[in-house]
């Protein structure tokens, strides 16, 4: 246990452990972790078991789509397996959350490629650390348009520049 939790002797070991586990999640600080822990403790046991099972099942069954690299519980995600989508147009996004944001607009009918990150030399994240290789393999197929929709951050712009200046695999 971390020092913060060692000083919280007023919590039982199990509550402290639950708080510590929640605080490991991104964006969850100590106060939020405490709120979540006490909320879970006050939930009916069936709901807690449902939550725990959903987490375990997702971790065991969710994997990368073999085509676009988004997260899915099938070999090929519903978007890539949809024959009504324009498979000749690929939009490159950084995360599955970015994909979901574009899908919510209902305006895009192509398919996606999820990089699962962006290039960040300052953080030691290079082209080999994101799913660029898979994208280059896809571009060897029948693709008419590549839409680069990385984030407007320095890392997203760096990634977009690399994609824009990379030679096409068909050249």
What are these regions (language model features)?
Residues 9-16, 24, 34-90, 95-99:
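Cys/His-rich Zn2+-binding cysteine-cluster or related metal-binding knuckle/ribbon modules and their
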Residues 150-160:
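Acidic, metal-coordinating catalytic cores used for nucleic-acid/nucleotide bond scission
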Residues 33, 82-150:
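Extended interfacial segments that mediate partner engagement and assembly in macromolecular machines
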Residues 48, 124-125, 156-157:
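Alpha-helix N-cap/helix-start motif
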Residues 104-105, 159-161:
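Short amphipathic alpha-helical segments
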Residues 1-8, 164-171:
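Conserved small/polar residues in nucleotide/adenosyl-binding loops
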């Amino acid at each position: 246990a971390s020092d913060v939790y060692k000083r919280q002797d007023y919590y039982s070991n199990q509550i402290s452990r639950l708080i510590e586990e929640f605080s490991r999640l991104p964006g969850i600080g100590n106060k939020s972790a405490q709120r979540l822990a006490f909320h879970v403790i006050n939930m009916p046991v069936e709901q807690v078991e449902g939550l725990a099972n959903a987490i375990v099942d997702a971790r065991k069954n969710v994997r990368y789509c073999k085509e676009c690299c988004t997260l899915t519980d099938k070999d090929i995600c519903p978007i890539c397996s949809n024959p009504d989508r324009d498979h000749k147009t690929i939009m490159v996004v950084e995360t599955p959350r970015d994909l979901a944001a574009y899908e919510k607009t209902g305006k895009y009918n192509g398919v996606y490629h999820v990089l699962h990150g962006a290039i960040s030399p300052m953080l030691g994240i290079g082209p080999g650390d994101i799913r660029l290789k898979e994208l280059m393999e896809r571009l060897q197929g029948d693709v008419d348009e590549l839409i680069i929709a990385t984030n407007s951050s320095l890392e997203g712009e760096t990634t977009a520049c690399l994609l824009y200046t990379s030679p096409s695999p068909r050249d």
